Design a protein with these regions (language model features):
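A short, basic/flexible loop-to-alpha-helix module at the beginning of a structural domain
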Residues: 1-11
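Residue-level detector of alpha-helix initiation sites
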Residues: 16, 20-21, 186, 287, ...
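FAD cofactor-binding and catalytic pocket of flavoenzymes
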Residues: 30, 89-108, 112-115, 119, ...
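Glycine-rich loop(s) and the adjacent beta-strand/alpha-helix scaffold that form part
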Residues: 32, 36-61, 249-253, 261-332, ...
Length: 543
């Protein structure tokens, strides 16, 4: 896609920082509106075979990543063990810090396409209940937008991406413009019937992407920007890609409320270059975008609220494996964003002594290994994962503490921990999961009692994913907040159209702009916000 020898210094109509789910869409939206766009990514532009690799070579790379310390934190996530570790950032080359007693597991994808290449592909809308906010340490923290503001963008994205799902009629999980849902497995249908009839809890088809079909989709999955928005953006002829360049900061005119471009650091040699543009769109992922803004403050960026970097959130989560009687022989369809199920509890929770809501995502009969590796070959294996809303708190924040990378770029210091509210939510999740498993005739068990794992069992000792406790912040890869949108400049960092209050020609459209976390998987809403903000910027440009 890229030709680094071409002139890129500008001036451009727009610079888009990051090429993942939001960055690819921002580039496409702006280019289709007539803007000349430079798309900058910190990582390389990989070919499909380089990105996905194959087994057993990927396994050897995982073991090397663990033993060398390059993937010490990211290897805690189960997704690491089914992907090419090349899609996970080298933690030695790209460090960050956190307090010793408050770990933060930050998963990064430093390549063109970003984390969209490892995204699970679940697409859920937020509701007005979510946008209305949640009770926090600062009172009720709400969004300055509602579902009506994003309706057209949600619908356009769902149609473009071709996601699956039912129309379930839930006020707290609005229906979308989806294709037919993917079918439950026989065990999932049995589970859903039991939970709905005996506990009164609704079990719905998950909403999202089906399995990647190379014959239909091409080499890249449609859930990735490489398989959807990026090739469309490049086909306009108005987008140029600058790979292997990490954006260090905004260029800010002294005493001005305008950014004139960005400073980008060549990852091959550390050389810095100034790239000029009328508009800058930050889509680098939540913490990367916050780090860019924090470094820009040192260059003169004004931020009137004093809230930049504060109120970082991730979804709090916990998981449970189980087995249940096999209701019949059959093939095992793959686990995907749409090939799975949800218990969309939201805030409708009996006996809850905490604020916020959660959902339970699960699958049964989609990932069993061969029978000789199963301790209970007559059963089918399932899992439930709870992910819940987190209360925004000023003490959970991203700052700069003087640590730098190999090229002297200041790296983020992440200080984030769960409060008693999140811990109470996790306890409720675990009770709810065990109730559901029991009424469905299943048995909740640790993974080691379900499978023989002779080669990898030593690696699983102490694994976060197998713990009954709340996983550390960052584990769920749904980090949001730190540059919240607000109705006025004293309560947030960006306005309702994602413009920095201190520099209105800079848009922050990724998860950093979220005032609250809600409980739903965030990517679809991030993309809807991106499309809305970029379309608004095009209207201002035309005027």
């Amino acid at each position: 896609m890229s030709n680094p020898s071409e002139q890129v210094d500008g001036p451009w109509d727009a610079i888009v920082v990051g090429s993942g789910a939001c960055g690819g869409l921002a580039a496409l939206t702006l280019a289709e509106g007539g803007a000349r766009v430079l798309l900058i990514d910190a990582g390389p532009d990989l070919k499909p075979q380089q990105a996905f690799g194959s087994e057993p070579a990927n396994l050897l790379r995982r073991l090397a990543g663990l033993s060398s310390g390059r993937h010490r934190r990211q290897a805690q996530h189960p997704g690491y063990w089914k992907a090419n570790p090349r899609l996970y950032a080298d933690e030695l080359l790209h460090p960050y810090t956190h307090p010793t007693d408050r770990p933060f597991l930050w998963t990064r994808g430093l390549q063109v396409g970003g984390r969209s290449l490892t995204w699970g592909g679940i697409t859920l809308r937020l509701s007005d209940e979510d946008f209305s906010g949640v009770e926090g340490g600062d009172g009720v923290i709400a969004w300055p937008i509602r579902t009506a503001d994003l309706e057209a963008d949600y619908a356009a994205l769902e149609r473009m991406l071709g996601v699956h799902g039912n129309r379930d009629g839930l006020a707290h999980l609005p229906d979308g413009e989806t294709c037919d849902p993917l079918p439950f497995t026989a065990a999932e249908r049995s589970f859903a019937d039991a939970v709905q009839s005996q506990l009164g809890l609704q079990v719905i088809h998950s909403r999202g992407f089906g399995p990647h079909q190379p014959q239909r989709d091409g080499a890249w999955p449609r859930s990735s920007s490489c398989g959807s928005t990026l090739p469309q953006a490049m086909a306009t002829g108005r987008v140029k890609l600058l790979a292997n360049h990490l954006v260090e900061s905004l260029l800010v005119e002294h005493g001005s409320a305008t950014a004139t471009g960005v400073v980008a650091v060549d990852q091959a040699n550390g050389n810095r270059r100034s790239v000029m543009a009328d508009l800058v769109v930050l889509c680098a992922s939540t913490i990367q975008s916050l780090a860019i803004l924090l470094r820009s403050q040192e260059q003169g960026l004004k931020e009137p609220s004093g809230r930049l970097g504060s109120r970082l959130m991730d979804h709090v989560s916990t998981s449970q494996f189980f087995c249940m009687p096999q209701p019949g022989a059959g093939s095992q369809p793959p686990l995907t964003g749409a090939g799975s199920f949800f218990l969309p509890c939201g805030r409708r929770l009996d006996g809850a002594d905490f604020s916020g809501g959660y959902g339970l995502w699960g699958g049964i009969g989609r990932f069993d290994p061969p029978s000789w590796l199963r301790r209970r070959p007559q059963s089918v294996t399932g899992f439930l994962i709870g992910h819940g809303e987190v209360i925004p708190q000023a003490c959970n924040r991203v700052t700069l503490n003087g640590a730098v990378d190999r090229w002297g770029v200041a790296v983020p210091h992440i200080d984030c921990q769960w409060s008693s509210n999140e811990l109470a939510m996790v306890a409720h999740m675990r009770q709810q999961m065990k109730r559901c498993i029991k009424v469905a005739g299943g048995e909740a068990l640790p993974l080691k009692e379900l499978f023989h794992l002779p080669l990898v069992e030593p690696l699983l000792q102490g694994a976060v994913a197998l713990s009954d406790a709340a996983s550390p912040p960052g584990y769920y890869i749904h980090e949001v907040g730190g540059a919240a949108m607000s109705a006025d400049p004293s309560h947030g960092v960006v306005d309702p159209y994602n413009r920095l209050w201190g520099a209105p020609n800079v848009l922050v459209v990724d998860g950093a702009c979220w005032p609250t976390s809600a409980w739903q998987s965030p990517t679809l809403t991030m993309m809807a916000i991106t499309r809305r903000a970029c379309r608004r910027a095009l209207k201002r440009r035309a005027a």
